[in-house]
Amino acid sequence: MELLEVGHESAEEAVIVLVKGDVDSSTADDLRDQLTSALDVATTHPRRLVVVDLVEVNFFGSAGLNALLDCYEAGRVAGTAVRLVADHPQVLQPIQVTELDRIFEIFPTVSDALQR
């Protein structure tokens, strides 16, 4: 099991949340905290956009899905879009199985997410 590293940065195009490692019940609160903080920053960002980069995530459990869903719902209320970046089955499969791909826009790269 790999420890979770998560943080966010405000870029010209969006607030980007970088996630690396395993997202499970023991690490999801850290993810949730960073997502909440990123949403707070995004409310004053010109594009009102949060991009969550999950490319370096090795395991993505249901607690992580719940954190993303909470972020999406809070963003919707605040008028801030939330987009995901994922390119491998460890992250995509749980999102697809739970049909969260119907509400999240998912892109293979951060660049693609920013261009949309």
Predicted regions and their residues:
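Actinobacteria-biased recognition of intrinsically disordered, low-complexity terminal regions
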Residues: 1-2, 116
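General small-molecule cofactor/ligand-binding pocket signal
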Residues: 7, 85, 107
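Residues that form or immediately flank small-molecule/cofactor binding pockets and catalytic motifs
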Residues: 11, 89, 111
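Residue-level signal for pocket-adjacent positions within structured domains
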Residues: 18, 99, 109
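C-terminal alpha-helix
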Residues: 38, 113-116
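Short acidic-hydrophobic, aromatic-tinged amphipathic segments that line or gate anion-handling sites
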Residues: 104-109, 113
